[in-house]
């Protein structure tokens, strides 16, 4: 039986970018979780793009693993983009399809349904963003399978990163949780057509940083527990 099955494996953090000066609070959290003896893996969606880092970064022992970096989809036509990037994703799709055929089919169905729900107008094309997030989830699932020691996933920020994590959880069967912070839980465009509620329903728990945020998340109607972990200054911090 694998470590992931027995629940004694690693926690995989899924982040949009790492390390980031604007998100030192996340790096500090990772450092503190390591200090508690929790084994981690770090999976990062976007390539590192900052040269200056906070000092806490060097204290984190777990090294980040960056997901595949496709070309921009923002202004590209989806068929052309898929043709340009299929060679990058195809090996992971094949491996994941062999290991998790049902999970991959379910995740593809979730992504397709969301792409249709999130159309800006009834007659508009489905939102292509969710194709990209599905492929990123397949890449993540493939890496989790190869690692073989992850027991659960945790994402920071409740929009794109959590969508990728939710889909990867659907594929692999690993439980996931996420932390919601600010605009990622309040801005409808970032989680259109009820997406945030669906991700909450699928998660084992949700974390946020203020009581106002907790009340807002609770108002969405999900029964998933929402925990508050306040930001603060640790006056006893030792370098």
Where are these regions (language model features)?
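Acidic anion/phosphate-binding donor-loop and adjacent secondary structure
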Residues: 73-76, 188-190, 218, 233-239
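Carbohydrate-associated surface elements
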Residues: 212, 232
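A short beta-strand/loop micro-motif in the catalytic core of glycosyltransferases
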Residues: 201-211, 227
């Amino acid at each position: 039986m694998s470590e992931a099955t027995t629940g004694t494996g690693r926690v995989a953090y899924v982040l949009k970018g790492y390390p980031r000066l604007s998100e030192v609070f996340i790096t500090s959290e990772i450092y503190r979780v390591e200090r508690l003896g929790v084994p981690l893996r770090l999976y990062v969606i976007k390539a590192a793009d900052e040269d200056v880092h906070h000092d806490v970064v060097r204290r984190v022992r777990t090294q980040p693993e960056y997901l595949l970096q496709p070309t921009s989809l923002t202004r590209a036509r989806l068929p052309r983009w898929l043709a340009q990037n299929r060679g990058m994703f195809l090996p992971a799709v094949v491996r994941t399809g062999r290991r998790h055929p049902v999970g991959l089919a379910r995740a593809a169905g979730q992504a397709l349904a969301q792409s249709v729900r999130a159309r800006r107008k009834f007659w508009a094309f489905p939102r292509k963003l969710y194709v990209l997030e599905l492929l990123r989830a397949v890449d993540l699932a493939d890496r989790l399978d190869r690692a073989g020691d992850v027991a659960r996933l945790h994402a920071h920020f409740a929009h794109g990163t959590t969508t990728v994590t939710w889909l990867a959880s659907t594929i692999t069967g690993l439980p996931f949780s996420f932390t919601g912070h600010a605009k990622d839980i309040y801005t409808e465009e970032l989680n259109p057509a009820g997406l945030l509620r669906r991700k909450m329903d699928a998660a084992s728990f949700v974390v946020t940083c203020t009581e106002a945020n907790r009340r807002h998340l609770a108002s969405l109607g999900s029964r998933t527990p929402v925990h508050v972990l306040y930001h603060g200054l640790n006056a006893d911090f030792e370098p």
